[in-house]
């Protein structure tokens, strides 16, 4: 884990994604262990707490050393995971906001609609816009090359609005 994290940081990563999968059993302990391990070994690197297990995200936040930056909740969307915006807001965390609902947005109009919904939800809960990082959801480049320019346009639209973006 440490070797892989160092490789990512050496390559220019600005945060590390701590993906423990669904981790239904022992997820809370696993996330706590991973957060402590990475924060003890790397200075000033924010960590993205990535799991569908909400209790594991909360456990990671509970041991997070904020002198190394804010924790990042990965992720919320405009459908079944919108409550992760509330979780991030309640814990003064950043949230990766996926610009989708029940499925991938079909075009930038739909992406921007989801972006607006997510931004409004965060701001209603007291979040700064800078604490929402919008992910337009990159599609498989090989299979859907015609959609990639739209994704790049969406990133520019986020930037033009003063919003942060990310992608994975």
What name fits each language-model region?
Residues 90-168:
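Catalytic alpha/beta core domains of metabolic enzymes, predominantly
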Residues 17-22, 45-53, 70-80, 99, ...:
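Catalytic beta/alpha-barrel core
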Residues 1, 9-20, 39-42, 66-69, ...:
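Gly-rich Lys/Arg/Thr-decorated short loops/hinges at beta-loop-alpha junctions or inter-strand turns
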Residues 1-5, 27, 72-78, 102-110:
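Active-site mouth loops of central-metabolism enzymes
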Residues 9-10, 61-68, 82-93, 124-127, ...:
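Acidic (Asp/Glu)-rich catalytic clusters
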Residues 9-45, 138-145:
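Glycine-rich, proline-tolerant flexible connector loops at the mouths of alpha/beta enzymes
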Residues 2-8, 81, 117:
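Short, acidic/polar
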Residues 26-68, 152-165:
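Alpha-helix-loop-beta-strand connector modules within alpha/beta enzyme cores
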